C-alpha cells in the first residue's frame, strides 16, 4: 500500500456509535469492531488519539432542557465519556494495544490527568491515547473537546465519524436529491450554514487551520483507506 497521508490523527466517535442497534449503553460487538479499525490504523504506522462522546449513556444538555441544572448535567455527561473511554480501552487492550485514558477532570484512581506533553509522548511511544471528559468545562461539547485536543497534540487531521457518509447540502434522510460535498472550505460551511459540528468546535478548527474530515464508519477498513489518501466523506479545510 501507499505511504500514509497522515502521521497523527484524532478520531471523534459519538457515544451513540457504541450502541449498535440498541437505544442505550454499549454493544460489545460494535465496540470490538471499532477497536479493530483503530488498531488497524495504528499498525499501519499512524499515531492515533480518540475522543468518544457520552450520548449513549447520558446527555447533559437534554436533561438541562427538562429542568436539571446545566452545569450538573454537563458534569454527568463528562463522566459518561469516561465510562466509554474505559470501555474502549478494554476492547483495545484485549487486542494487544497499549492504551492510555486521559481525563480533563481528575479521576486519578481510574485514569491519568490530561497533560499535553505526556499525551504527545504516549503517541510517540506507540500508545493509543483516549481523551475523556471533553474540555473539562460545562457548556462545551465533546466536539469542542476533540477539536481542542487535536490542536494541542498537533494532529494532522481531525476525523469525525457520523451516521452519514459526509456533509450534504440538505438532510439526506429527508431528501433523496441531497448532494454530498467531496470538499469544502471553512468559509463555505459558514456561508451555506451547513451542519458539520458545533460552533465552538468549528471555530477552533478553522482558526487553527486544522483539516477536518466528516465520514461514515459503517464500512470496514474505511479508516485505513482515509489514512492512505482515499477521498472518503467530506474534507473541510482552508478558507475561500
UniProtKB/Swiss-Prot annotation:
Residues at which ATP binds: 12-15, 55, 59, 162, 168, 171
Locations listed in the record: Cytoplasm
Chief location of this protein within or outside the cell: cytoplasm
Catalysed reaction equations from the record: UMP + ATP = UDP + ADP
Family: Belongs to the UMP kinase family.
Assembly mode: Homohexamer.
Protein name: Uridylate kinase
Organism per entry: Xanthomonas oryzae pv. oryzae (strain KACC10331 / KXO85)
Amino acid at each position: 500500500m501507499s505511504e500514509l497521508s497522515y502521521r497523527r490523527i484524532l478520531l471523534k466517535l459519538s457515544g451513540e456509535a457504541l450502541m449498535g442497534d440498541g437505544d442505550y449503553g454499549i454493544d460489545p460487538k460494535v465496540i470490538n469492531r471499532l477497536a479493530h479499525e483503530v488498531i488497524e490504523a495504528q499498525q499501519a504506522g499512524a499515531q492515533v488519539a480518540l475522543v468518544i462522546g457520552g450520548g449513549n449513556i447520558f446527555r447533559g444538555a437534554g436533561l438541562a432542557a427538562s429542568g436539571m441544572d446545566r452545569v450538573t448535567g454537563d458534569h454527568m455527561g463528562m463522566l459518561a465519556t469516561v465510562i466509554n473511554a474505559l470501555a474502549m480501552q478494554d476492547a483495545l487492550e484485549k487486542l494487544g494495544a497499549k492504551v492510555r485514558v486521559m481525563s480533563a477532570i481528575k479521576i486519578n484512581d481510574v485514569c491519568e490527568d490530561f497533560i499535553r506533553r505526556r499525551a504527545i509522548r504516549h503517541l510517540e511511544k506507540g500508545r493509543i491515547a483516549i481523551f475523556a471528559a471533553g474540555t473539562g468545562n460545562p457548556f462545551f461539547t465533546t466536539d469542542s473537546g476533540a477539536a481542542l485536543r487535536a490542536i494541542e497534540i498537533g494532529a494532522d487531521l481531525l476525523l469525525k465519524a457520523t451516521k452519514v457518509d459526509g456533509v450534504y447540502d440538505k438532510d439526506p434522510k429527508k431528501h433523496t436529491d441531497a448532494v454530498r460535498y467531496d470538499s469544502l472550505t471553512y468559509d463555505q460551511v459558514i456561508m451555506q450554514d451547513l451542519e458539520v459540528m458545533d460552533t465552538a468546535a468549528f471555530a477552533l478548527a478553522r482558526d487553527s487551520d486544522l483539516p477536518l474530515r466528516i465520514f461514515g464508519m459503517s464500512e470496514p477498513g474505511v479508516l485505513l483507506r482515509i489514512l492512505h489518501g482515499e477521498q472518503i466523506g467530506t474534507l473541510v479545510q482552508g478558507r475561500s
